Structure formats: C-alpha cells, structure tokens
Amino acid sequence: MCTHTGHSAAPSLSGLIDAEPCHFWLPLMPNEPTDVLPPTSFNVPFGTRPGIAALGERFFTRLSPTPLPSPYLVSVAPAAAALLGWNETDLQDAVKDPAFIDSFVGNAVPDWADPLATVYSGHQFGVWAGQLGDGRAIRLAEAQTPGGPWEIQLKGGGLTPYSRMADGRAVLRSSIREYLCSEAMYALGVPTTRALSIIGSDAPVRRETIETSAVVTRLAPSFIRFGHFEHFAAREDHASLRQLADFVIDNFYPACRNAANPYQALLRDVSLLTADMVAHWQAVGFCHGVMNTDNMSILGLTIDYGPFGFLDAFDANHICNHSDQQGRYAYSQQPQVAFWNLHCLAQALLPLWRDANAADPEAEKAAAVEAAREALDPFRDRYAEAFFRHYRAKLGLRSEQEQDETLMTNLFRVLHENRVDYTSFWRNLSRVSSLDNSHDAAVRDLFLDRAAWDAWAAEYRARLQSEQSDDAARTTAMLATNPKYVLRNHMAETAIRAARDKDFSEVDRLMAVLSKPFDEQPEAESYAKLPPDWASGLEVSCSS
C-alpha cells in the first residue's frame, strides 16, 4: 500500500511507546461473503491447511474474488510453480486447462480454496494511516507442501471490505514489474515473496490514464505484516493481538516459545531478519520505494513491489519513488526506516508483556519499555555484520581487516561523485588484477574522473595483496556474488510496452535471463549494457 500522507522524523522507542493509542481506524465491515462464484474442480499437486483462517473472523473476511472478463495468461514462473509441486511438464499441461486461468484470476473458486481478505493497519510515510487492507489482495488458499506452507494470494483480485475508496484492481504495468522482480530477487538470493503467474484482462481501470487489469498470483509462507499487529494494538484488542502473535510464533518462530518472554523474543528475531533483508537490498542496489509498516513482512521478506528500482548510476540518496518527494525512502535511508518500522512493531507488541495489575505502574511501564529496547538493540550490529559480509564478498576479500571500512567508505564516495553504474562496476571489478592495472579498462571507463578510480584502485590492490589474493579464485567468487543482470526500469518498461500489444515474449525472456543473474548468458548480452538515454526519463510512482 502506498499513500503519501506526510513526513516525520524517526522517533525514539520511548516516544512511540509513550504515544497515546491510535484510534483512527475504519470500523470492520460486516463479515458477509460477496456473490458466490461457481466452483471449479482443478487438480493441484498440493494439499491445503487453514493457515490464518484458523484464527477466526476477527482477522479476515471470507469473500469471493471479483471476476475479470476474457482473461488470458501473460506468463507463469516455473521456479515458483515448483514450490507448489508442479514440474515443468506438468505445469505446461496445467496452464492449458481453462480452470488454471479461472482459478488464478478469480473467475471461479477451486474446491480446494478458502478465499479471504485479512485486515491490517499501519504507518504510511511516517504517519498513522489507520486501516489499510487487504484492499485488493485475496488469499486463495494455504498450500501444504513438503517444503512447508505457501500462502497463495491473488493481487488485484477485486474489492474487499477493506478496499476503502480503491477499486480492488491491479494494472498490467505494475503486475509485470512485481512478477519479474519477485523472481529476480529470489535468484539474487534476497529474501522475498514469490510470483507464480500473471493473468491479464482488457477490463479498463483508471489510474493516471486508463489501463488494463491483471492479477498476480503471489506466494509466501505468510503475508502477515507489521500492520496486522498494529491494527489490533490500535484497537486495544489485546486478546486478538496475542492470538496473532501466538500464531506467528507457533508457525514460524517456534524457538521463541521457550524464551522467558516469547513476545520479546519474537520482536528480536523479526528485527534480526529485517536487518539481514535490508543489508542484502543495499548490496544488490535495490531501492524498495515505499517502506510503510504495512509493507513490512513479519518474516523478513521483501514484499509489495511497487515503485521499486535498482540503482543505475550510483547515488547514495537515490529516490526511486516519484511520489516520495522528501526522500523518506531513499536508498541511503532504508536501514534507518527499517529500524523505525521495527519501533512501530515494538509499540504494537508491548501490551503482550505489560502487567495491568502491577503494584507500581510507572516502574512496570519502564521495565516493559526496556524489554522492547533490549529486543531491538541487536538490530544495528546485525545490520552492520550483514552489510560488511556482503561487501567483503563483493570486493573478493576473504578476511576481515581494520581498514576495510575506510576502503568501502572511500569507494562509495568515488562511486557517488562519479555516478558510476552500480551493477556494471561490481561485475567489471571482479576481473581486475591484484598486481597491476592490466585489466582495469572496463571498470575505469565507467568513471568521469579516471584519477579517482586510479587512487582507489591502488588502495584496493594493496588490500588484496595483504591477503595474497589468488586472482583466478577471487574472480570466480566475485562473479558468483556480483550479478551481471538486474531488473532495470527500462528493461521492465520494454516488456510492459510489448505486453500492451499482447506480445508477452519479452516478459518470458526477461524471466529467463533474470533467473540466472550471475551467469554470462552470451545471448542476453544486451541486457547487461548501460541504460539507454531514454531510461533517465522513466518515473515510477505509487500508482499501480
């Protein structure tokens, strides 16, 4: 969800904890189903389990998706389908069955499905926004597979009781971007939700202009967000809040159950996974664009691909979201924003270890706040450890040395000053020699100030020589760490323009290339080139 409602500085934990409870939610809608869709018998290679439906109807509304006229398959992702048990041969047979399209666009409800929309709230651009969703995402079912549970969700599946003033739809443009980036991020090794398919329709929807509709089928072990906890905390519904936390602990963080304070342990573990995720974003040059608390996964997964972007020319303060005029979610701000969002989660969870009958309420409150601080304290160290681990690997360094932070700081400075293409830099750096500048040309040519490269390269070579780096082994390791292919905005735009004319070949071509981002792929060399001049004029925003 992406709504620009303002901007605020990150408060301290005590500031959040001490704030008055928020009461700006919309009332829950009556839990009544929409018109019942025709059932369909569509065989799938997985069983199902209740998942979040076991919590009861305070957490969701059962409903049917809203059908789309004349749906058509845009693309299906074999790697994501494999999570549900389809091999490539069976998948090709499955997509030929009209029931596949009907099931995953929302035109019929399979006999194994239990569609519902969950309720959550959250902070958007630093401001409490009240109840937010699910406004257009409908959980179709929760698959039970040998690899664990996979929640199957239709994004763009139609109106829900939580749609507010929106239409419940997603457009083809944004659906292609989310579909491709979900699978690209997985291939890069970044924790992420997955994407099974896109199904389109010529049904018109109004955004800045009239566009056509699409539904992305998304997969994740769970789509529970920070905002789910914020919703019940804001309503002071502590029983439901505890029930939700227990569900998450029992299903995803079972080790927390053995802690003296399981809910504090949950907060700590979520913060650690969030730190890992954001450090990985920084390393691959990914900018999320709209890190609202309702877009933060309780499992530390990248979720809700909207106005995202990968860095082209390196700018530490890059803003990928045209709607983010003040740069709250700029590339350099992502770690701090993640920490701010964790403070919001801490505030939501705090009632779970408060004692309403304490003899000394002030002392009890201080102790509860301190427990929250203790849970969040490891975030900074965990983020720093993950950050330096990723960048040492990107630099081909096998050991930790005291000067590494200075080496990296100097590198980021010259990359920023020269607006060096981020992905191309790291890929070409993988092949430089530790002994001389004989293999420097490809990376040196990326710099406007060649002397700046020469100075930093001398520093880098000295560092490599200090650990007697073997160039061949180092190059192999760096090429497996520094991708050749990422989903640049102009690549997605090219696929979108073709798809508007019902040519989906570029979507499938990109999916194939991005599924092997570290491989050379000579036939895909054009996707590794610097962005064309027209790409600088592309803007992405919250419109989806």
Swiss-Prot record:
Cystine bridges: none
Q: Does the keyword Transferase apply?
A: yes
User: Where along this sequence does the record place binding of Mg(2+)?
Assistant: 295, 304
Q: Which cofactor does it need?
A: Mg(2+); Mn(2+)
Q: Which residues bind ATP?
A: 133, 135-136, 155, 167-168, 218, 225, 304
Write down the superkingdom of origin: Bacteria
Entry keyword set: ATP-binding, Magnesium, Manganese, Metal-binding, Nucleotide-binding, Nucleotidyltransferase, Transferase
Query: Which residue windows are transmembrane per the record?
Result: none
Catalytic reactions on record: L-seryl-[protein] + ATP = 3-O-(5'-adenylyl)-L-seryl-[protein] + diphosphate; L-threonyl-[protein] + ATP = 3-O-(5'-adenylyl)-L-threonyl-[protein] + diphosphate; L-tyrosyl-[protein] + ATP = O-(5'-adenylyl)-L-tyrosyl-[protein] + diphosphate; L-histidyl-[protein] + UTP = N(tele)-(5'-uridylyl)-L-histidyl-[protein] + diphosphate
Catalytic residues (positions) = 294 (proton acceptor)
Q: Which GO terms describe its molecular function?
A: AMPylase activity; ATP binding; magnesium ion binding
What Enzyme Commission number(s) appear in the record?
A: 2.7.7.-, 2.7.7.108
InterPro entries, from UniProt? Answer: SelO
Q: Which HAMAP family match?
A: YdiU_SelO
Protein family membership: Belongs to the SELO family.
Q: Which NCBIfam families match?
A: PRK00029.1
Q: What does this protein do?
A: Nucleotidyltransferase involved in the post-translational modification of proteins. It can catalyze the addition of adenosine monophosphate (AMP) or uridine monophosphate (UMP) to a protein, resulting in modifications known as AMPylation and UMPylation.
Record protein name field: Protein nucleotidyltransferase YdiU
Organism source for this protein? Cupriavidus metallidurans (strain ATCC 43123 / DSM 2839 / NBRC 102507 / CH34)
